[in-house]
Swiss-Prot record:
Keywords: Magnesium, Metal-binding, Thiamine biosynthesis, Transferase
Family (UniProt): Belongs to the thiamine-phosphate synthase family.
Residues engaged in binding 2-[(2R,5Z)-2-carboxy-4-methylthiazol-5(2H)-ylidene]ethyl phosphate: 132-134, 162
Entry-linked InterPro entries: Aldolase_TIM, ThiamineP_synth_sf, ThiamineP_synth_TenI, TMP_synthase
Binding site for 4-amino-2-methyl-5-(diphosphooxymethyl)pyrimidine: 35-39, 67, 105, 135
Reaction(s) catalysed (UniProt annotation): 2-[(2R,5Z)-2-carboxy-4-methylthiazol-5(2H)-ylidene]ethyl phosphate + 4-amino-2-methyl-5-(diphosphooxymethyl)pyrimidine + 2 H(+) = thiamine phosphate + CO2 + diphosphate; 2-(2-carboxy-4-methylthiazol-5-yl)ethyl phosphate + 4-amino-2-methyl-5-(diphosphooxymethyl)pyrimidine + 2 H(+) = thiamine phosphate + CO2 + diphosphate; 4-methyl-5-(2-phosphooxyethyl)-thiazole + 4-amino-2-methyl-5-(diphosphooxymethyl)pyrimidine + H(+) = thiamine phosphate + diphosphate
GO molecular function terms noted in the UniProt entry: magnesium ion binding; thiamine-phosphate diphosphorylase activity
Gene label: thiE
Binding site for Mg(2+): 68, 86
Record-listed E.C. numbers: 2.5.1.3
Protein name stated in the entry: Thiamine-phosphate synthase
GO biological process: thiamine biosynthetic process; thiamine diphosphate biosynthetic process
Organism taxonomic ancestry: Bacteria, Pseudomonadati, Pseudomonadota, Gammaproteobacteria, Pseudomonadales
Ubl conjugation recorded as keyword: no
Amino acid sequence: MKLRGLYAITDSQLLSGKFLSYVEAALDGGVTLLQYRDKTSDESRRLREATELLKLCERYKTRLIINDDAELAARLGVGVHLGQTDGSLPDARALLGHKAIVGATCHGSLELAEQAKADGATYVAFGRFFNSLTKPGAPAVPLDLIAQVRARVHLPIAVIGGITLENAPQLVEHGADLLAVVHGLFGAENAQEVTRRAKAFMALL
C-alpha cells in the first residue's frame, strides 16, 4: 500500500475544547492518515470521539487509525496502530482483515520492523528522532536508521518524535514516507494555523 504524507495524531489534552475544530482544520490542509490517540479508560467517550472523527475523515477522504485498540477499530471498520505492548499484530490483522491499515511501533529497531512485516504490518513507525513532548523519555533514534529500514523492509516508514516544519525536511531526505506529528501540528494558536501547517507538511512530501 502506498502511504505518503502527513500522519496527524490527536492528543486529547492538547486539543481540549477545540478537538473537532482543530482536527477538521488539519484535514482541510491535507492529511494522509489521522490517528485517534487517547490513553484514558473512558470507553464511551472514546467511541463517541472516534465516531465523530470517522465522519470527518470520510468527508475529507482521509484514512482513520485507532491507537492501541483493535476492537474499537474493528467496530468502526478502520485501521489500528499497535505499540510493542498493545496486543498481537497477527491477531489485529486477523480481526480487521487483509485490507485494513495496521501500523507497528518499532522504536529504533530494524529487527522489530522485520518482524512487523512478517506479522502483516502495513507500515512501520520509528522514533523519537527529536525531543518529544508526547514521549519525553523515549530514547533517540539516529536518522540513518531510516535508510537501513528502506533497504531491508520495503514498507512505508512513519517517523515520530518532536517533528516540526523546521526539522521535517531532513527526515524526508533520509527516506521517511509519513511524518507523524502531534504538537508540531496541533500546538498552533488557532485553527487557521493548523491548516497552514498541514499544507506545509504535505508540501514536503
